[in-house]
Design a protein with these regions (language model features):
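Transmembrane helical cores of multi-pass secondary ion antiporters/exchangers
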Residues: 1-415
């Protein structure tokens, strides 16, 4: 496709999406299905107007997916409602840790015993497919800072945290393949990748979020009443936190999410203390002011990346192994890991059941795959993991995209 054709395609999609927002909101399918259909139509599966090669363009796709995930994590973090309590966060933390590890193990076992992959590749594939996606799962996430729905809160928190908690397993898989130094008996992996990278990321994010919240509050309410550009502040916070984490070998995804959470929570606390009788939303806050712009960027990145996904697939990309892996992940690995991981958390069984199904895979999985390729994954293995991951993500868009709205509507009617 020429640049003019790309401008026409993206421009037309933006116009249609903008004009049919209400219609699509009421329809039983998600916007990602529409974008995927367009990508499949113009890609090699149908009209063959373009083909996006994820192996040759792995560096570009890594950068695009990285930015998309960062924006989505920030948007999710600043929508976290209420004050932080351990009881409220217990289930999401268990989903992002215990359930994550169980999913990686189950997928790795399937990959080794059924797909005949080496152990390192199996663990890597499990880490790629285990995280739920913050970009494509917006329909099951918190809609605004005042949304108190427990299911949405749980799924949003999980997606915010598990894009960082999956990284140690990615590095473990690369290490077992000889592409990363795990240290003697895995000591470096435990100390650096598991402990330091996780704790350091959370600390960096929380400190940065609190600092920006207090600085913005002080400047806005000082004697000179400074006008702040909230969009720039939000993007700046993402950039500084992520860049600092890359420099000190901490997980930047985790840090950005917790920076956004800390920013939102601190601003709310300052507002309640200084102006306890103010109406919610009446005070200018960095977290709220930057949210609308980030959500628009999130929608745009979703459109572009899902179209590219459709442009990667050929008709012969659909193998029994890839379809079987998808069904195993959706029907066995995710439900089992959620039910076992949240055992004893106090979360109602209905919410655990829906969380077990709403494990949307998407842009985050593509990022981890491209990250592994950029770290020296052998080409034959890279091609095999590309084919498996693309089919899993595509099936997730189709299966979850057609079931999420009807199931959520049924859940709310019975609540």
């Amino acid at each position: 496709m020429t640049s003019a054709q790309w401008f026409l395609l993206i421009g037309a999609l933006l116009l249609v999406r903008g004009l049919t927002a209400t219609l699509l909101e009421r329809s039983p399918v998600t916007s990602a299905i529409v974008y995927l259909g367009v990508g499949l139509l113009v890609g090699p599966s149908a009209l063959n107007l373009f083909h996006f090669n994820p192996l040759k363009e792995s560096a570009l796709l890594e950068a695009l997916t990285e930015v998309a995930v960062l924006i989505s994590l920030f948007s999710a973090g600043v929508k976290m409602p209420g004050t932080f309590t351990f009881a409220r966060w217990r289930a999401p933390v268990l989903l992002a840790t215990a359930s994550m590890a169980l999913t990686v193990g189950l997928v790795a076992a399937f990959a080794v015993w059924v797909l005949d992959l080496p152990l390192g590749a199996g663990i890597l594939l499990g880490a790629i497919l285990a995280p739920t996606d913050p970009v494509l799962a917006t329909d099951v996430q918190i809609r605004h800072p005042g949304d108190r729905d427990q299911l949405r809160f749980t799924l949003t928190c999980e997606a915010g945290m598990n894009d960082g908690s999956a990284f140690p397993f990615v590095m473990l898989g690369l290490g077992l393949l000889g592409l990363h130094n795990l240290g003697d008996w895995g000591t470096r992996w435990v100390v650096v990748e598991v402990l330091w990278a996780t704790v350091g990321a959370i600390a960096i994010g929380v400190v940065a979020g609190i600092a920006l919240a207090r600085l913005g509050w002080m400047l806005r309410r000082g004697p000179k009443h400074h006008v702040l550009l909230d969009d720039f502040l939000g993007l700046g916070l993402i950039g500084v936190v992520y860049g600092l984490c890359v420099m000190v070998d901490a997980w930047g995804f985790l840090a950005v999410f917790f920076a956004a959470v800390a920013l939102r929570q601190t601003e709310q606390k300052l507002a309640r203390t200084a102006l306890p009788h103010a109406e919610p939303g009446s005070l200018p806050l960095v977290s709220e002011g930057s949210l609308v712009f980030k959500e628009h960027l999130e929608r745009l990145s979703e459109m572009v990346l899902v179209i590219l996904l459709g442009g990667t697939l050929f008709l012969n990309s659909w193998s029994w192994g890839a379809v079987g892996l998808s069904l195993f992940l959706f029907l066995v690995a995710r439900p089992v890991s959620v039910m076992l991981g949240t055992w004893g958390s106090g979360t109602p069984l209905r919410i655990r059941g829906l969380a077990a199904w709403f494990g949307v895979r998407g842009v985050g999985s593509l990022y981890y795959l491209m990250y592994a390729i950029q770290h020296g994954l052998p080409e034959p293995l890279a091609l095999q993991l590309i084919q498996l991951t693309l089919i899993v993500v595509t099936m997730s868009i189709l299966v979850h995209g057609t079931s999420v709205k009807p199931l959520l509507a049924l859940f709310w009617r019975r609540s």
